[in-house]
Amino acid sequence: MYVEIVDVRAREVLDSRGNPTVEAEVVLEDGTMGRAIVPSGASTGKFEALEIRDKDKKRYLGKGVLKAVENVNETIAPALIGMNAFDQPLVDKTLIELDGTENKSKLGANAILAVSMAVARAAANYLGLPLYKYLGGVNAKVLPVPLMNVINGGQHADNNLDLQEFMIVPAGFDSFREALRAGAEIFHTLKKILHEAGHVTAVGDEGGFAPNLSSNEEAIKVLIEAIEKAGYKPGEEVFIALDCAASSFYDEEKGVYYVDGEEKSSEVLMGYYEELVAKYPIISIEDPFAEEDWDAFVEFTKRVGNKVQIVGDDLYVTNVKRLSKGIELKATNSILIKLNQIGTVTETLDAVEMAQKNNMTAIISHRSGESEDTFIADLAVATNAGFIKTGSLSRSERTAKYNQLLRIEEELGKVAEFRGLKSFYSIKR
């Protein structure tokens, strides 16, 4: 089937932090349109594809994206008009070649990705198919286990917690709907616990709380308390996941990590994590070490990778070259997938496929600067990834993804699968 792209256009819109981002629209020959908004991260890996910002301090404090919009309207549009909307790999290859840089810094990953996503949406809309079915085919049926970021620290919060995300993982349920309900009930229980203890319960970028607690371990204890008080069983129905984002507390010059006010070597930090894993129902740890500390990842995965999902985010930046190295070294047993780290839909799908073929799990993830766009909800089901990270149970740019997954689960009906603990196929539990 050949359906021509007849128009490609972009505009500057706002993300959930009130910063500009790129929205693209792709129009097909019969008038069908696909639209997409790209997200933006706060803690970014240094190997990520680069978004372009205007750096004009008089507009949006330098964060405008008019240059990226111009790149879509004046460079990308002429190249894609006349192309087949159903040839996503060729569209994305054209975008990559048009840019010509390793990290998409000429046209901007924000310009390229907005168009790549919009093309996929337009093609799905033309066929009258839901996006997950267009991208994933008839076998797209697995609803993801949500990793819900309910306590924020690190670069996502102005508090004294080093680790960036403390998540609840409702994996012990039979449907996505039940898992979501458990997450919401725990979230509200947690709010009550924090409020009664005198903590501020305002929420951060991803909808989680950012209390000043005495240590990272105290944050885990508070989560366990919330799970129990909400009427659920920690370690059976609901588990804990951590995103350490360790690059943010690593001193490159000294080669040490700063955790709980102390200097720690990779080896000492490893011991610290092992103690936490022994004491609490921690099922997943993301970026426990800095993005170039490969040896520590390899050793840690060797030690605890049979019982804990070790996830590479900044380590891999959704890049198949870095992922290949990780697979070869057995550096992790899981990868975090972010569309805007790599910059096209095809490259994202390639990374998921490579991980899954090598018995690694893939977690489809949002960014801290999100929008009402629900592309990643469909992507999680399209790839049967089994996991999604899309924030807490508040802020509508987060709940938009959960609501889309509820719709998809309902639409799939009896075919829908929520694998729960079985989604953790890279570990033996």
UniProtKB/Swiss-Prot annotation:
Tell me which cofactor or cofactors this protein depends on. Answer: Mg(2+)
Q: Where does Mg(2+) bind?
A: D243, E286, D313
GO CC aspect terms:
cell surface; extracellular region; phosphopyruvate hydratase complex
> So where does this one cross the membrane?
none
Q: Which InterPro entries match?
A: Enolase, Enolase-like_C_sf, Enolase-like_N, Enolase_C, Enolase_CS, Enolase_N
Any single biological process term in GO: glycolytic process
Q: Nucleotide-binding among the record's keywords?
A: no
Q: Which SMART domains does UniProt cross-reference here? A: Enolase_C, Enolase_N
Any Pfam family matching the protein: Enolase_N
Q: Which SUPFAM superfamilies match?
A: Enolase C-terminal domain-like, Enolase N-terminal domain-like
Name where it's found. Cytoplasm; Secreted; Cell surface
Supply the enzyme class, top level: lyase
- Paste the cofactor note: Binds a second Mg(2+) ion via substrate during catalysis.
- What Gene Ontology molecular function terms does this protein carry? magnesium ion binding; phosphopyruvate hydratase activity
- Using the UniProt record, give the first listed, main subcellular location: cytoplasm
**Which keywords has UniProt assigned to this entry?**
Cytoplasm, Glycolysis, Lyase, Magnesium, Metal-binding, Secreted
- Under which pathway is this protein filed? Carbohydrate degradation; glycolysis; pyruvate from D-glyceraldehyde 3-phosphate: step 4/5
Substrates-to-products reaction catalysed = (2R)-2-phosphoglycerate = phosphoenolpyruvate + H2O
Q: What does the UniProt record say this protein does?
A: Catalyzes the reversible conversion of 2-phosphoglycerate (2-PG) into phosphoenolpyruvate (PEP). It is essential for the degradation of carbohydrates via glycolysis.
Q: What is this protein called?
A: Enolase
Write down the species: Thermotoga sp. (strain RQ2)
